[in-house]
């Protein structure tokens, strides 16, 4: 599945060009991300950065986009929402990215949601299962992972119906990420 995400990304870009009736003349497609390269979940940011760069380099080295190159720009947000907002503004207004890809974290993505809703920039494969990305009617948001609610419903079903457990203890992170999981568990 992981190998298919970058392929789907490029299919999405092609369809986006087609349906927007735009001719993309630029030789470089600039894609950007704000990632936790340092801080408490730096390993997640490093994984997204490493995986995306590996595939984008493969695409560029093998001329898969017919003489167009992908430039992947990333900035460290340390999993801090305020830094994510600053990074997003830099990516959009300074770097002039065509698409946003692989942002990591529920609190960080939630902080940029009002900005994203006003723009027509594709926001592709954020690494969060938050419901706020699924509740709106924004055609520029493309999710590839399950929602936290779907994951928790499956876990509760398994524990209750398959394992016969009637009590579940809950420990959750005290932020938007943890709260969403906790509420999803109560609803399941």
Explain the meaning of each model-derived region.
Residues 5-17:
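Hydrophobic membrane-insertion alpha-helices, especially the h-region
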Residues 44-50, 64-132:
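Beta-alpha junction/loop-to-helix N-cap segments that form part of ligand/metal-binding clefts
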Residues 43-65, 183-188:
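Short, polar/charged alpha-helical segment
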Residues 19-33, 63-69, 160-166:
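Immediate post-signal peptide segment of exported/extracytoplasmic ligand-binding proteins
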Residues 26-48, 103, 167-171:
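Short beta-strand segments enriched in small/hydrophobic residues
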Residues 35, 74-77, 172-173:
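Short glycine-centered, acidic/aromatic-flanked micro-motifs in structured strand/loop junctions
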Residues 1-3:
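N-terminal hydrophobic targeting signals that begin at the initiator methionine
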Residues 97-188:
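Extracytoplasmic ligand/sensor domains, especially the bilobed periplasmic-binding protein
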